[in-house]
Amino acid sequence: MSRYSSSWTPLPALPDPEGFAGMYAGTCGEIMICAGGTNFPEKPMLEGGAKTWTDRIFTLSPGENEWKEAGTLPVPYAYGASAGIREGLLCIGGCGKEGHRKDVYLLN
């Protein structure tokens, strides 16, 4: 899982059958982090399904074959910006069920 590799390797699926849109994603050292996001677990949006927001955080370490659940965000939200920095993963802004947010969190 070198960040400087010129080849792609498929990663294991996140442990949720629906997956998530709008997640915060990046790396902290060699560990990948995915947090937050939205999905439609009951039925698809085009069939009138209700969007849900998640606060779940997942990590994937080098050589591992499955994601680990690693805590939760302070609130369920998604669709912000994320940046991997030396200290961890910055999660910047986004929105939740109640509307737009301007919080900034550091996950490490």
Predicted regions and their residues:
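Kelch-like beta-propeller repeat domains
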Residues: 1-108
